[in-house]
């Protein structure tokens, strides 16, 4: 399977699950994982978008190391996508509006759990490596973008 085919499979999976495990490296060099709502934008298929507050730990992590990983899976575990890339923290009002619209009602839990005040920012992950694992079919595919 070619990289663009894996990316197509990922976009289909993301439409279904809308959430992924986002992994950063903290200032002490340890991985930090947290579940996040994520989306892609049609005009930027090689990127993953999410939002956070500028005061969050993940934003501090990205300030010292922008290398990240994502993991997405179907509840049945018959498709799992692993992504590696570089993340940027962006404070662009137009992009923020597009991302919030793409994330839509999936942010309801985010607003309840994170009532803190702060500036909402976009986390944009440029996908560099992608791997699709299909355990039930005993299949693995990987590609670089």
Predicted features along the sequence, with ranges:
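Short, positively charged
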Residues: 1-5, 60-61
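Charged, gly/pro-rich active-site loop segments
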Residues: 2, 82-145
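Onset of an N-terminal alpha helix
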Residues: 3-11, 15
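A short, Trp-centered hydrophobic/proline-enriched beta-strand micro-motif
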Residues: 12-27, 68-72
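Short, surface-exposed beta-edge/turn micro-motifs
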Residues: 17-19, 46-48, 65-68, 117-120, ...
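Hydrophobic/aromatic beta-strand elements that line small-molecule binding cavities or substrate pockets
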Residues: 36-40, 85-87
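A short mixed-secondary-structure module that forms the rim of ligand-binding clefts
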Residues: 39-77
């Amino acid at each position: 399977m070619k990289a663009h085919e894996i990316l197509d499979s990922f976009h289909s999976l993301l439409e279904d699950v809308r959430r992924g495990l986002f992994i950063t490296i903290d200032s002490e060099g340890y991985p930090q994982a947290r579940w996040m709502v994520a989306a892609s934008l049609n005009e930027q298929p090689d990127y993953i978008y999410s939002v956070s507050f500028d005061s969050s730990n993940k934003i501090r992590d990205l300030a010292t190391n922008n290398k990240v990983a994502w993991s997405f899976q179907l509840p049945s575990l018959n498709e799992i996508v692993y992504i590696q890339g570089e993340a940027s923290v962006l404070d662009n009002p137009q992009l923020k509006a597009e991302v919030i619209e793409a994330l839509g009602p999936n942010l309801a839990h985010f607003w309840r759990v994170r009532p803190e005040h702060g500036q909402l920012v976009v986390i944009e992950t440029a996908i560099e490596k992608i791997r699709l694992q299909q355990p039930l079919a005993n299949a693995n595919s990987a590609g670089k973008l």
